Amino acid sequence: LDKVDITVKRGAVYGLVGDNGAGKTTFLKLLSGHIYADEGELTLFGCHSRKDIEEQRRRTGAVIEAPGFYPQISVEKNLEYYRILKGVPGKRAVDEVLELVGLADRKKKRCRDLSLGMKQRLGLAIALIGEPELLILDEPINGLDPSGIIEIRNLLQRLSREKNITIILSSHILTELEQLATVYGFLTDGKLAEQITAEEIKEKCSDYIEINVSEPERYTAVLEKKFHTESYKVLPDKTIHIVNPMMDIGAYSRLASENRMDISRLERRQVTLEEYYMDLKNGGRKYA
């Protein structure tokens, strides 16, 4: 990692995006105290010294890789163990997090008998004991089925919205991260390539018409003449992107047919997080 400096507003959901080996898990492990830096300096909540950082970590909860718990004992007893370990007073804290993550009716169940989705919920419950301000999650939906993914997504959104908990998480499922995160950090080779909000991405990446025609050069010429616009890009594969289209999609189809050009593809699209990330990796020319 090299000078990774992120700023996250209270209650935001911060999505870390990057290829395998980019540094996502290493960064989250450093934040949560699972590993320590060989060199350099870590700052957390404005604190620099190891002693102060350890104190600040009381304000955090984390699930890194597989949640750790004892499979032979009940959900409730596992949480009671972690409550004591964290020095959180009052058994009521266990009941509160069980209710929060939707495990109150399964508290007597042994952990080995839980589904994968329920185990993920238990991991979150352990992280939430002590009412952390910051939740650090590494691949929280990894291995879940579609219904489990939806359950965890809804839970994290509720924690952010109702409890004002700040969440930093990584996920290789960018379509899911797109539905959850309010701000993104793109990591490349251990460096923060860009930090941008979901709203800023939306503003930079407006709807566009994607069209493949038999004669792209002639099509763009008649496009300019007919609609008085230069808001288009011709990609290396000759695909045309008409940015901020002012006409309905049928008008662009008629333009081709009136000028005797064949269309192989024509659709209205919105730039996805995956497309934005791939463009950023390739130099960030498309959506600058």
Walk through the language-model features, giving the residues of each.
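Secondary-structure boundary motif
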Residues: 103, 158-162, 203, 225, ...
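Short, charged/small-residue-rich alpha-helical element at the C-terminal edge
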Residues: 207-280
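ABC-family P-loop ATPase nucleotide-binding domain
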Residues: 283-288
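ABC transporter nucleotide-binding domains
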Residues: 1-169, 174-188, 192-194
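Generic structural marker for isolated residues within well-ordered, non-membrane alpha-helices
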Residues: 79, 94, 156, 198, ...
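Conserved beta-strand-loop-alpha-helix hinge in the C-terminal portion
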Residues: 191-214
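Short, flexible turn/loop "capping" segments at secondary-structure junctions
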Residues: 36, 57, 201-204, 233-234
